[in-house]
Amino acid sequence: MSFRSVLLTALLSLSFTTTMQAAHHHYHRYTDKLHRQNHKKDLISPKPTEQEACNTPSLSKELIPLSEQRGLLSPIYDFISERLCLHGVSVRNLKQALKNSAGTQIALDWSILPQWFNPRVSHAPKLSIRDFGYSAHQTVTEATPPCWQNCFNPSAAVTIYDSSYGKGVFQISYTLVHYWRENAATAGDAMMLAGSINDYPSRQNIFSQFTFSQNFPNERVSLTIGQYSLYAIDGTLYNNDQQLGFISYALSQNPTATYSSGSLGAYLQVAPTASTSLQIGFQDAYNISGSSIKWSNLTKNRYNFHGFASWAPRCCLGSGQYSVLLYVTRQVPEQMEQTMGWSVNASQYISSKLYVFGRYSGVTGHVFPINRTYSCGMVSANLFNRNPQDLFGIACAFNNVHLSASPNAKRKYETVIEGFATIGCGPYLSFAPDFQLYLYPALRPNKQSARVYSVRANLAI
């Protein structure tokens, strides 16, 4: 019997023997985005509370009688019966009709991000006479600001069935990133930084989510198979999504991560209590970039593994989440070193207007220059009760730089301080000026700081 068969059998057996209550309000990047976008201007559903804003869509707690179970064509009939023409065709009405009739949620995020930076030319130290023949002369990189990033991220979740046997949900999320003029990777080289100035430093296309989830009755267990990324759970509300919160590489994701941007696999999620969640899973180790879905890699017998634990308490101050992620990646041609990494995240609402968060993460090996990071920050949402999209945030990240992974690094550390203000313009459009200050750039000993100015325009439908 092969390893794949044993692992899949164990996951299925555990899913059927677990009988605990399902967990709620645990952060998931794409599910939260769908939930947030589909509650804008929602006049039918009640106004979501602070706790619901971080929830995944809850499952039915009672078994549905066979006489009330929906047929295969029921969503089509229900959608026609909504009679959109009578109520006026609009984005809100269309999304509400899809949600009510077909159990479908759709989110479209499109952002344009110009970034100005200084310095613009990298520094090449002069070699002394004793260095000739022993040290290579560093190449000088020059970049002309601004660099323009165009990022499009559509997401969708479709409830295929909802019966006494549970609920089946298909979820997809795709990220497409293009650049005009310079890209962020070139700008980072010119500034001589260890970390990038945004989450996607070069042109990318990522199938970050292409999964089917079987949620078992009574919210006990869920089993997910397909292509997914650990970026979806590794973080908190504002330090894991460049289109919503912070922009810099160290504050918009886990900068030490060596796991895939999207790869085929499966994971099982179990909830011992309503406020805790446990997850264990595996992925194909070969697909690092996630730019396509590579079914043939599953037969190559190399897999990455992860375990995840989350606690989401609710106290007198507000809801919070505290999580730990452990993962192991295998050595493959696309990543020539086996690594083991960890990420500890904490977030807490101090009040309905103030959200604080922190992260400590690290990784073994020499895959990327940053091997440890410590970050913390705070975000105030809708401080003046003007627009639900209004945000004010400030955060700081301290990054340790592994000199073996970055031979040109002159310092063992690099610090970034970032602040942004999102200004909502109606329910869908927002603008966010952002400022990044880098203290002691790791690759530039002759400069003590570098600066990045950005203005993010985001359309979230």
From Swiss-Prot:
Record has Membrane as a keyword: yes
Q: What is this protein called?
A: Porin AaxA
Q: Where in the cell is it found?
A: Cell outer membrane
- Which gene does this sequence derive from? aaxA
Signal peptide range in chain numbering: 1-22
Q: Write the record's keywords in alphabetical order, separated by commas.
A: Amino-acid transport, Cell outer membrane, Ion transport, Membrane, Porin, Signal, Transmembrane, Transmembrane beta strand, Transport, Virulence
UniProt entry tagged with the keyword DNA-binding: no
An individual GO BP term: amino acid transport
Q: How does it sit in the membrane?
A: Multi-pass membrane protein
Which InterPro entries does this entry report, sorted A to Z?
A: Carb-sel_porin_OprB, OprB_sf
- Chain's role: Facilitates L-arginine uptake, as part of the AaxABC system. The arginine uptake by the bacterium in the macrophage may be a virulence factor against the host innate immune response.
Q: Kindly list the GO molecular function terms attached to this UniProt entry.
A: porin activity
